[in-house]
Swiss-Prot record:
SUPFAM superfamilies: Ribosomal protein L1. It comes from the Bacteria. This is Large ribosomal subunit protein uL1. Part of the 50S ribosomal subunit. Binds directly to 23S rRNA. The L1 stalk is quite mobile in the ribosome, and is involved in E site tRNA release. PANTHER family: 54S RIBOSOMAL PROTEIN L1, MITOCHONDRIAL, LARGE RIBOSOMAL SUBUNIT PROTEIN UL1M. GO terms for molecular function: rRNA binding; structural constituent of ribosome; tRNA binding. One of its GO terms (cellular component) is cytosolic large ribosomal subunit.
């Protein structure tokens, strides 16, 4: 268990768990409490007003964070011919078909994102039991099964993040690192919230953005006033 520092204890005592803080203040508090020796990630949890048990209310998608995530993503692409060349030119780290499938089956997966051209799904489809549990299975809903593999690669490299609501109706994501300027973190969160709003199911009733909280890897969490996000 991580040791709580005196600084974190002092900050925790000042933070009201029931108060909604303006986004700028919330991020400032979280960054101040992020005292680990590494560059902690700044994370967000968004509770949505949906019933995650209903298939027509599953919120899923992808968004390119304008200021990146602070992490360089390694991208693998299943493609052949001209599409393979386009993927390589766009900066894909690994491109292949049957040879790439063999790597996956052998447990050799040195990548964070998998993209596939539509005609490659005959190969990728056999890898579902391996890629699926790792969150790597390409899906057209998040833009990772697409004829435009070059754009998909560029988006992944530029800081695209995928999101999917969990069984409790919460979306978890990372909006950057402690080393990011506050305005960049605010911009990234605003982009994620905008994407979530656009992905709102037609059958969702009542308040959609119920709770938003930001936190760091090892630090405390702070609730955010959603009315201050759009203006950030």
């Amino acid at each position: 268990m991580a040791k709580i520092t005196k600084k974190q204890k002092a900050l925790a005592g000042k933070v009201d768990s029931n108060k909604l803080y303006p986004l700028a203040d919330a991020i400032g508090i979280v960054k101040e409490a992020a005292t680990a020796k590494f560059d902690e990630s700044i994370d967000v949890a968004v509770q949505l007003g949906i019933d995650a048990k209903k298939s027509d209310q599953v919120v899923r998608g992808a968004v390119v964070l304008p200021n990146g995530t602070g992490k360089t993503k390694r991208v693998a692409v299943f493609a052949q011919g001209a599409k393979a060349e386009e993927a390589k030119a766009a900066g894909a780290d690994i491109v292949g078909m049957d040879d790439l499938a063999a790597m996956v089956k052998a447990g050799d997966m040195p990548f964070d994102v998998v993209i596939a051209a539509p005609d490659a799904m005959r190969v990728v489809g056999t890898l579902g039991q391996i890629l699926g549990p790792r969150g790597l299975m390409p899906n057209p809903k998040v833009g990772t099964v697409t004829p435009d593999v070059a754009t998909a690669v560029k988006n992944a490299k530029a800081g695209q993040v995928q999101f999917r609501v969990d069984k409790a109706g919460i979306v978890h994501g990372t909006i950057g690192r402690r080393s990011f300027d506050n305005d960049k973190l605010q911009g990234n969160l605003a982009a994620l919230i905008d994407a979530l709003v656009k992905a709102k199911p037609a059958t969702s009733k009542g308040v959609y953005l119920r709770k938003v909280a930001v936190s760091s890897t090892m630090g405390l969490g702070v609730r955010v006033d959603t009315q201050t996000i759009a203006a950030s």
